[in-house]
Amino acid sequence: MSILDKFSLKGHVAIVTGAGRGIGRAIALAYAEAGANVVCAARTLDAVEKVATEAKAFGVDALGVSCDVSDEAQLDALVARTLSVFGRITLLVNNAGGAAPNNPLHTSADSFDAAFHFNVTSAFSLSAKVAPHMLKAGGGSIVNISSSASRYSQKYFSAYGTAKAALNQMTRLLAADFAPQIRVNGIAPGAIMTDALAPYLDEEGTAKMLALTPMNTMGMPEDIAITALYLASPAARWVTGKILEVDGGAESSTWPY
């Protein structure tokens, strides 16, 4: 097998959550370009159907499925739909997640729990649901999308940062549970220029963020997609339980506020 062949995903079936835009969309398209059939899942059906259409341009099969990952029944339906169409599941990307910056003095326990459920519990549930099918298929790979907020001290991220830190540790623990047949890894992106980040950045905020980033540029969704492709591919066959930091070299918070 050539070096380039080790990055091929031909014969694989992938579920990517949060695939309607940003990082999730970029990962879904990268997996499709590498040869995988892709199920694009997100709450907005129109968005994921559009991404699925883009994925098909690479000569693979793709499907858009409406799914709120916080809803257990919808996760079951997502897995069932994937199996009914493709017959197997070998790759999963738990990308859906997020939470707005929060002032802990004005954050209810319910809001904190909701952030944890959205970012951690949903990823655990979907991983547990697909793992038996990966084992039946002979193995698989799970990639969890975390955040640099999981390791930096920064203001107003006590809900999101705590949840992503928990996701990191869950990644390590599931890697031990599922080895050697299923590899489980994570990616901790830094500042990625997406629709989710853009509303928080004005010209001054962007300049501060760039100044705090050694590479002096914002990351793009494709930077994370390339990393996710590596982790899913045979090229990473000996990598599990790891969190790859893709953050422009930042070793402290780049949040400008």
Where are these regions (language model features)?
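Alpha-helical segment proximal to the catalytic Tyr-Lys
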Residues: 132, 175-180, 237
